[in-house]
């Protein structure tokens, strides 16, 4: 089931959980979507700022599988 997250802090907390498997990054012209797959939910965070999105991408945990979708 999908669930949207509004805060970057909450997204990073979810990314550090044990059941977090993979992150998909979808880039559009206007925004960047980060979708993290956990055991129960697919959490989505929408970031409008491109610089903020790059910072967030670098701050993801190293053990997490990252896949970029265009």
Curated annotation (Swiss-Prot):
One of its GO terms (molecular function) is structural constituent of ribosome. Keywords: Ribonucleoprotein, Ribosomal protein. InterPro entries: Ribosomal_eL38, Ribosomal_eL38_sf. It comes from the Eukaryota. One of its GO terms (cellular component) is cytosolic large ribosomal subunit. Transmembrane segments: none annotated. Belongs to the eukaryotic ribosomal protein eL38 family. This is Large ribosomal subunit protein eL38. It comes from Aedes aegypti (Yellowfever mosquito).
